[in-house]
């Protein structure tokens, strides 16, 4: 937790422990600003933050009251009007800068990573190194093993100080950005130490700086309280006479003091156990900069803010660990290697967990302290700030950043944006600070000269130990670096086929040509400025500058360094482009022991939890009242974080470390089996109960009156009765018995089953030991029973149905009953008969068919019964419930299914499959009928002799449709004229072939006229072969052969007229006495309906008559009648011929 109101006072007075220094490096330019480097922020810890800026202008320091951050770097931006000069020869961005404008200095609002260790080491890069190969590990508490004494010095910096630095370039013109990759280096920073005096085993008493207090290392190790006392004394020292730094008109940094080293005894190691599975993440967010566009302007110091909130399970123990993961493309710090995360503390300053950072995996591992053993229901939140890792992201791109708390991930899409070079004419340049080494007091700057690879003439580059404006003019002021012959200046040439990373950060200089030696005679120094004469160039160059700086008189960092490029145009005029980088520091305070002003007093709250036997809400009014142990009490801080304790054996609890003026909330967990007692039962605040939750504000004193009382919750019963409702009226009658062994289930208001029982021999059931509340009772229907009607009468005499709700309110509830009656059973079946007349109706003369298999299926299609008809054709299925069924009849062999649904349900045939629904009654209407098919054969063979000429006229009616083709040879002349009309109700198709010259085709309602002219001898032999097919509702196939032989001795002319009219309707075989012998073979086939007809038994329709079957006999009669008529006319013609002779 951060005490924002006391931030300035904390900075001015006393020692502040657990404070981290953060540095942001600013780029000042007309219209642009950029910041490098990132840090982490963790709630509850302070940090000291530094900014680096570029360009000239007066600045007003602005204090920011950020709460908790970890190695955060932020930069102020100065935006001026700019114009763009297009140059397509290089992919680097172009930025045009106009007049320089004053820029207000901003101090970062985000705190940096808190150092856990008391001894911080720093690494310095004085020569080009391949940072890619470095593996900088978090610093450790080396002081615990050092044989050194502790020296507390008045006016020195707080311990555990981390410096985190970022850079911002500046110049006058914006051009295309470079596209070559860039790298990032982390440097662990430490403030300059005062010149040490050689002192062994001494501690300087802060109250008397001139007289050291002799304390041995062993004494400090064995007596940590002594160390705390020394620190406390130093914190209480009056610093009022110490001059306070006044912010100048340009830059007013705060003091960054030398580190103090303490030898502290380390606790015994505790076995580590990852408990990520016991960490519940409640909220995670990722925000880039202001969160409006998700653009990470890496040179403008736009940070990536990761916020996470989580709870710590009560199973977590001291020594257990959890993890926080950064995305692989970000780093907590850009200019330093100080990536050690600060401790997670609660608002009172107690440490919950200590963290270490693994640079290779970019993972923080937090180890829990004994805080988790003392407190319960801990809620924590963490805010981590990081920055784009220029080593893994050398150029502008789009990323999907992923962070994770305890393995639970969240992601955000981000666009990475880098700065533009400053351009004016052919002059184009850009620069950033890349590394800060506070131990050696050096700062590294990397400069891109002519990154656009223009053809520049008379090129000179100035490196100034102060800011420069956009015209290259040096602006003297605070924070000057030292630029002289001892300044390390390296120059590298970029080949034409190489592209500079847009990140403006080089990690491996070996890939470029080192041309430093070429400038031995082209480099001059004057007035803290180095000038390099490049002459006429068309290539890009990199300058790496490592310069010394001198801290300000109060020990704070104030670093500024500028660079400018000047060229001449074709008219001989100079074009300037400049960048400035500078660093300033600001202080942020956070949670922890060191963040509290020495003079600030902390307070406590608490008191007592008791069992209020008489429920009056007043303590001590009943001798049976007693304290309640192990009651969970939770304190919620103003920032929403919580911690919990349990009452001791005397019912007491206490929370300390609370601040005056702050408002807190205390909540009491109601113990199982108890209820909260009456609130404010008396005006005596020391004796009343404050209820389950109370809010309190600290008003300059402790508050030990926050009490609460509970009483045991009474228990109740619920239940009643299950009976057989024989008359089905839903009312419990005196003569109706209970039903035993009925299952009853009890559920609470959430639907959770809390009990199951069965009724006893008298139908009674009961659930006991129940609290007030709403319950649900479910009755299981007994086998063979049906639920009766419900809610028909008074509550204690009716049936509540299968499911009912029961309410207990300070009394038993014995009114939940349910009634059932025995479920009736039904039968299904009827009759299978021989339908001799095929009309689909059961006639009295028609008999049943025995042994027909009948199958019964339920609604799911499952076979539930199979039977056979008895000798009378009867069948039945019994013991059936109401429902849907299907009856399937198996067709007997040799029989045909009769027509279905021709009359009433109980007299018709229902077909091979019948669907039926039983609803509270039997159904004996499911019948089916079958009949046997007819078949006939006849052969006809005739032989006749005739000797005559005849004229024949015949008229016949026929119910058939036939095609006839006959051919005959004869030694006589005959004329035949036949006229026939045919009208039939059926269609018959017959085909006959005969050897004659006549062709006859007749159809129903047809008029045919045929002429036959034949010449026959008295001796003739005729052979007739006809084949006819008839197809209607029946199939008829007949085959007849006719052989006739006639002799004649003369040739005569005869004119005879005979009329033959035959009309026959016959269903029989006939023989005729003549000289002809007829043998015919005919087959008759009658089509039948399918054997299985599936339809609803209660929806029958009468079938239409089968006309073709009924009229087949008439067709046969007509055919035979026609043959007899022909024979008769031949005989008659023969007699007349003989008479003429």
UniProtKB/Swiss-Prot annotation:
Chief subcellular location: secreted
Q: Where is the signal peptide?
A: 1-52
Residue ranges for motif LPXTG sorting signal?
A: 1104-1108
Is Cell inner membrane among the key words of this record? no
Which residues in this protein are found as Pentaglycyl murein peptidoglycan amidated threonine?
Answer: 1107
Q: In what way does this protein cross or attach to the membrane?
A: Peptidoglycan-anchor
The record's subcellular locations are:
Secreted, Cell wall
Q: Name one Pfam family in it.
A: Gram_pos_anchor
Q: Which residues are part of the propeptide segment? A: 1108-1141
Task: Please note every region of biased composition (Acidic residues).
Answer: 903-913, 930-1080
Which InterPro entries does the protein's record reference? Adhesin_Fg-bd_dom_2, Adhesion_dom_sf, Fibrogen-bd_dom1, Ig-like_fold, LPXTG_anchor, SDr-like, Sdr_B, SDR_Ig
Keyword Acetylation recorded: no
Task: Relate the protein's function as given in its record.
Answer: Cell surface-associated calcium-binding protein which plays an important role in adhesion and pathogenesis. Contributes to the resistance to killing by innate immune components in blood and thus attenuates bacterial clearance by interacting with host complement factor H/CFAH and modulating its activity. Also inhibits bacterial opsonization and killing by interacting with host complement regulator C4BPA and thus inhibiting classical complement pathway activation.
The record's subunit annotation is: Interacts with host complement factor H/CFAH (via C-terminus). Interacts with host complement regulator C4BPA.
Recorded protein name is Serine-aspartate repeat-containing protein E
Q: Which organism's genome codes for this protein? A: Staphylococcus aureus (strain MSSA476)
What gene does this protein come from? sdrE
């Amino acid at each position: 937790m951060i005490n924002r109101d006391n931030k300035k006072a904390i900075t001015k007075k006393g020692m502040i422990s657990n404070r981290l220094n953060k540095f942001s490096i600013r780029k000042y330019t007309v219209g642009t600003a950029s910041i490098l480097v990132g840090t982490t922020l963790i709630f509850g810890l302070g940090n000291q933050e530094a900014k680096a800026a570029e360009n000239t202008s007066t600045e007003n320091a602005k204090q920011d009251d950020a709460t908790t951050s970890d190695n955060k770097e932020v930069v102020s931006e100065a935006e001026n009007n700019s114009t763009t000069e297009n140059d397509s020869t290089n992919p680097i961005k172009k930025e045009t800068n106009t007049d320089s404008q004053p820029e207000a200095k901003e101090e970062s609002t985000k705190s940096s990573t808190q150092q856990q260790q008391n001894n911080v080491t720093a690494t310095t890069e004085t020569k080009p190194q391949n940072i890619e190969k470095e593996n900088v590990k978090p610093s450790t508490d080396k002081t615990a093993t050092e044989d050194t004494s502790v020296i507390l010095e008045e006016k020195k910096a707080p311990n555990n100080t981390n410096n985190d630095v970022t850079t911002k370039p500046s110049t006058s013109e914006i051009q295309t950005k470079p596209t070559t990759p860039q790298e990032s280096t982390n440097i662990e920073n430490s403030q300059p130490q005062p010149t040490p005096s050689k002192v062994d085993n001494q501690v300087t008493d802060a109250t008397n700086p001139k007289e050291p207090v002799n304390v041995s290392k062993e004494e400090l190790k064995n007596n940590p309280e002594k160390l705390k006392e020394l620190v406390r004394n130093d914190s209480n020292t009056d610093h009022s006479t110490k001059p306070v730094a006044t912010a100048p008109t340009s830059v007013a940094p705060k003091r960054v003091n030398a580190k103090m080293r303490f030898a502290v005894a380390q606790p015994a190691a505790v076995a580590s156990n990852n408990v990520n599975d016991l960490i519940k993440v409640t909220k995670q967010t990722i925000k880039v900069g202001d969160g409006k566009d998700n653009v990470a302007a890496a040179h403008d110091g736009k940070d990536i803010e990761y916020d996470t909130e989580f709870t710590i399970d009560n199973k977590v123990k001291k020594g257990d660990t959890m993890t926080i993961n950064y995305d692989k493309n970000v780093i907590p710090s850009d200019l330093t290697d100080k990536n050690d995360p600060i401790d997670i503390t609660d608002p009172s300053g107690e440490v919950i967990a200590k963290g270490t950072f693994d640079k290779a995996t970019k993972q923080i591992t937090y180890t829990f302290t004994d805080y988790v053993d003392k407190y319960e229901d801990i809620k924590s939140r963490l805010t981590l700030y990081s920055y784009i890792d220029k080593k893994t992201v050398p150029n502008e791109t789009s990323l999907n950043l992923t962070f994770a708390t305890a393995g639970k991930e969240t992601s955000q899409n981000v666009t990475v944006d880098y700065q533009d070079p400053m351009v004016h004419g052919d002059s184009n340049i850009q620069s950033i600070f890349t590394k800060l080494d506070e131990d050696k007091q050096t700062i590294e700057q990397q400069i891109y000269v002519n990154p656009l690879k223009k053809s520049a003439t008379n090129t000179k580059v100035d490196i100034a130990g102060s800011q420069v404006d956009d015209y290259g003019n040096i602006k003297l002021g605070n924070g000057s670096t030292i630029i002289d012959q001892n300044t390390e200046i390296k120059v590298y040439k970029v080949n034409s086929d190489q592209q500079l990373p847009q990140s403006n950060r080089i990690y491996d200089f070996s890939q470029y040509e080192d041309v430093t030696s070429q400038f031995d005679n082209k480099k001059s120094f004057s007035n803290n400025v180095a000038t390099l004469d490049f002459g006429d160039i068309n290539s890009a160059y990199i300058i790496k500058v490592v310069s010394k700086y001198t801290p300000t008189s109060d020990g704070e960092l104030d670093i500024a360094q500028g660079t400018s490029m000047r060229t001449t145009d074709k008219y001989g005029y100079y074009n300037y482009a400049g960048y400035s980088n500078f660093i300033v520091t600001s202080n942020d305070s956070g949670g922890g022991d060191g963040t509290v002003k020495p003079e600030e007093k902390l307070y406590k709250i608490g008191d007592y939890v008791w069992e209020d036997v008489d429920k009056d809400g007043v303590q001590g009014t009943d001798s049976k009242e007693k304290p309640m142990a192990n009651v969970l009490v939770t304190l919620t801080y103003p920032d929403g974080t919580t911690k919990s304790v349990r009452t001791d054996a005397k019912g007491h609890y206490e929370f300390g470390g609370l601040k005056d003026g702050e408002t807190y909330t205390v909540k009491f967990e109601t113990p199982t089996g108890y209820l909260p007692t009456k609130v404010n039962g008396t005006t005596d605040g020391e004796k009343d109960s404050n209820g389950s939750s109370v809010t309190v504000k600290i008003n300059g004193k402790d508050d030990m009156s926050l009490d609460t009382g509970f009483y045991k919750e009474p228990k109740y019963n619920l239940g009643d009765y299950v009976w057989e409702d024989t008359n089905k009226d839903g009312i419990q009658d005196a003569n109706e018995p209970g039903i035993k062994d009925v299952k009853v289930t009890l559920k609470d208001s959430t639907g959770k089953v809390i009990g199951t029982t069965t009724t006893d021999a008298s139908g009674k059931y009961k659930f006991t030991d129940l609290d007030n509340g709403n319950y649900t009772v479910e009755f299981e229907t007994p086998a063979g029973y049906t639920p009766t009607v419900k809610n028909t009468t008074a509550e204690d005499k009716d049936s509540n149905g299968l499911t009912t709700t029961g309410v207990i309110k300070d009394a038993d509830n014995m009114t939940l009953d349910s009634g059932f009656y025995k479920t009736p059973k039904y039968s299904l079946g009827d009759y299978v008969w021989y339908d001799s007349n095929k009309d689909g109706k059961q006639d009295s003369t028609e008999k049943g068919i025995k042994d027909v298999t009948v199958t019964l299926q339920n609604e799911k299609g499952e076979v539930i019964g199979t039977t056979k008809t008895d000798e009378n054709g009867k069948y039945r299925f019994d013991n059936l419930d109401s429902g849907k069924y299907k009856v399937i009849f198996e067709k007997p062999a040799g029989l045909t299914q009769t027509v279905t649904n021709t009359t009433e349900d109980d007299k018709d045939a229902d077909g091979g499959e019948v669907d039926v629904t039983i609803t509270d009654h039997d159904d004996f209407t499911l019948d089916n009928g079958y009949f046997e098919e007819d078949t006939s054969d006849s052969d006809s063979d005739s032989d006749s002799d005739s000797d005559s000429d005849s004229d024949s006229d015949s008229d016949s009616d026929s119910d058939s449709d036939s095609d006839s083709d006959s051919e005959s040879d004869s030694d006589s002349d005959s004329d035949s004229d036949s006229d026939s009309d045919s009208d039939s109700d059926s269609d018959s198709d017959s085909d006959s072939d005969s050897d004659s010259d006549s062709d006859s085709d007749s159809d129903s309602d047809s008029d045919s006229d045929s002429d036959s002219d034949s010449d026959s001898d008295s001796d003739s032999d005729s052979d007739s072969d006809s084949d006819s097919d008839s197809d209607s509702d029946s199939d008829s196939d007949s085959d007849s052969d006719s052989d006739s032989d006639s002799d004649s001795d003369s040739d005569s002319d005869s004119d005879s007229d005979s009329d033959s009219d035959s009309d026959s309707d016959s269903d029989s075989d006939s023989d005729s006495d003549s000289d002809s012998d007829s043998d015919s073979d005919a087959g008759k086939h009658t089509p039948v309906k399918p054997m299985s007809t599936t339809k609803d038994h209660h929806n029958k329709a009468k079938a239409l008559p089968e006309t073709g079957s009924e009229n087949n006999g008439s067709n046969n009669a007509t055919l035979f009648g026609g043959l007899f008529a022909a024979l008769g006319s031949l005989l008659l013609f023969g007699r007349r011929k003989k008479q003429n002779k």
